[in-house]
């Protein structure tokens, strides 16, 4: 199945270093970030998991659960956590899926169906497409996905910014402009008429074009 924005994120059962999970049950009513990496004990991925460990309180504050994935076994995850702690100064406290049979990677379009059924003997290059971020909304639908080359570390501040934008859209019927940061002006979505906007924003708005109306960030 091809996954797109607004598709229901496929459910699955998996092993992690923190125990077995059923994905949708684990998510509950929270937002979710599912991010994958090609292989444990690799340089870029080590820095990424460490960076996310440091930023986890920011995600927690937004009701976002984070979960990693690679096709390595649980034992490798556990050993690798020591390296991440040593390099980055903080141990990841979020689950990391051990997708040894490649099932979740295939389910989420990270590997082709003919990639085999075991991670044994696979190198980081074999798994280079296992390098995706999915942001999943509380309705279990995909809100965003990004795929990176294995040589480019992910910017989790940007992922957090995108979540801030999506959460505001759901709550306040607004969109965010290019290069927007929390606290900056936002855009009233076109489907909200001027009459409706007056009820939501009684103090008015800045009209740049009839279709481009800006208001202060309503998030408190």
Where are these regions (language model features)?
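Chalcogenol-based redox active-site neighborhoods
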Residues: 1-220
